[in-house]
UniProtKB/Swiss-Prot annotation:
PANTHER family: BYSTIN. InterPro entries: Bystin. It comes from Rattus norvegicus. The gene is Bysl. Required for processing of 20S pre-rRNA precursor and biogenesis of 40S ribosomal subunits. Residues 96-105 have a biased composition (Acidic residues). The modification Phosphothreonine is found at T155. This is Bystin. Keywords: Cytoplasm, Nucleus, Phosphoprotein, Ribosome biogenesis. Belongs to the bystin family.
Length: 436
């Protein structure tokens, strides 16, 4: 058999295998070529969008996002140059970030979008403010904070122990372990300077402790930064039961919000976001923030506008809203009550008849009122007539028309009267359906 001639181009190619090996290889699946083709296809897909094209796509998307943010943030105002966001504290990257850190960039983006709404001072009509002050409580009760509650509990406990135990067999009141105090004093130092980043693990476990109020008192909530208050609200709203969350809202969050509004004439963005996060438990939010704010009798128009904006922006279950409207309608009137009732009525819930009856009686109680009612009161009555005129009974409709004669408003009363007269009462509608 002659010698096989090898060409230059085929010097690296493999020779034909023996016939027996070719037959055996023919029975097997040839996966090598397919794998090579698949790998080649992946390379083609990866090379389809090059780095230069990717940069162009990201640049175009960024420009479109900036245009949208400028339109939504400034409205008709001329567009201002986009400022670079800066953190209030040292932005040192840390390992082991958890869910709190993942949400923080989203919070910063939201701050950019709403900087016009929250950084500007809330404009209040002086006439409305004077009208609301006429209905404020002249002798308001003393506001209680968490520190006051804890000190009262400690005093009561000490008195009880001293009364029950004799001097010989008496034991001192159990105090916190010194090591626990040392840990949470360190947590207090962190929260007093907190801007962003990871919270101490010792702080995150406070909701699981039986004496969480006493531990929280050690950290001095009144000295926390606004960012720390936001993170604390997230933790307590998620992990506490509704009754405990209500106490946190009422004793810690609400006093801080009111103090901030009174001092700066607007609400810090982080505290505003804390109020929104607190709505995770709507029952606790109404019982711990809105109802105490109305019951205090000292809620200013600025406070009502800021807190009311959260009601208009957030979705609230109808049962909690109905219970809150019933409670506000039955309590002593204050100017802020009209704002909150109007915002809740604007949500157009299918309210129970008991709530509607309470709202009607709430307005009818002003038939003998000698003081001039604020415009907010007439606006709330107009909203009730617009949204629920078909759900009122004939007697209620006639009583409200009589109320308009006793408490008139030159612009709003004709509109309210037109709404009431154009609707068919619910009892008349029921009679027609029965006859058919």
């Amino acid at each position: 058999m002659p010698k096989l001639k090898v060409t230059r181009g085929a010097r690296n190619q493999e020779r034909h295998a023996p016939l027996a090996e070719q037959i055996l290889a023919g029975d097997a699946v040839r996966a090598g070529t397919r794998e090579k083709r698949r790998r080649h296809g992946v390379e083609e897909e990866e090379e389809y969008v090059g780095p230069r094209l990717s940069r162009r796509i990201l640049q175009q998307a960024r420009q479109q996002q900036e245009e949208l943010e400028t339109e939504h943030a400034t409205g008709d105002r001329p567009a201002k140059p986009r400022e670079r966001a800066t953190r209030l504290g040292p932005g040192v990257p840390q390992d082991g970030s958890d869910e709190e850190d993942e949400e923080w960039p989203t919070l910063e983006k939201a701050a950019k979008m709403t900087v016009v709404n929250h950084q500007a001072e809330v404009v209040v009509d002086p006439e409305d403010e004077r009208a609301i002050e006429m209905f404020m409580n002249k002798n308001p009760p003393v506001r209680r904070t968490l520190a006051d509650i804890i000190m009262e509990k400690l005093t009561e406990k000490q008195t009880e122990v001293e009364t029950v135990m004799s001097e010989v067999s008496g034991f001192p009141m159990p105090q916190l372990d010194p090591r626990v105090l040392e840990v949470y004093r360190g947590v207090r130092e962190v929260l007093c300077k907190y801007r962003s980043g990871i919270l101490p693990k010792a702080f995150k476990i406070i909701p699981a402790l039986s004496n969480w109020e006493q531990i929280l008192y050690v950290t001095e909530p009144e000295a926390w930064t606004a960012a720390a208050m936001y993170q604390a609200t997230r933790i307590f709203a998620s992990n506490l039961k509704e009754r405990m969350a209500q106490r946190f809202y009422n004793l810690v969050l609400l006093p801080r919000v009111r103090d901030d509004i009174a001092e700066y004439k607007r609400l810090n963005f982080h505290l505003y976001m804390a109020l929104k996060k607190a709505l995770f438990k709507p029952g606790a939010w109404f019982k711990g923030i809105l109802i105490p704010l109305c019951e205090s009798g000292t809620c200013t128009l600025r406070e009502a506008i800021i807190v009311g904006s959260i009601i208009s922006k957030c979705s609230i279950p109808v049962l909690h809203s109905s219970a809150a409207m019933l409670k506000i309608a039955e309590m002593e009137y204050s100017g802020a009550s009209s704002i909150f009732l109007r915002l809740l009525l604007d949500k157009k819930y299918a309210l129970p008849y008991r709530v509607l009856d309470a709202l009607v009686f709430h307005f009818l109680a002003f038939r003998t009122e000698k003081r001039q009612l604020p415009v907010l009161w007439h606006q709330c009555l107009l909203t009730l007539a617009q949204r629920y005129k078909a759900d009122l009974a004939t007697e209620q409709k006639e009583a409200l028309l009589e109320l308009l004669r006793l408490q008139p408003h030159p612009q709003l009363s004709p509109e309210i009267r037109r709404e009431l007269q154009s609707a068919v009462p619910r009892d008349v509608e029921d009679v027609v359906v029965t006859m058919e």
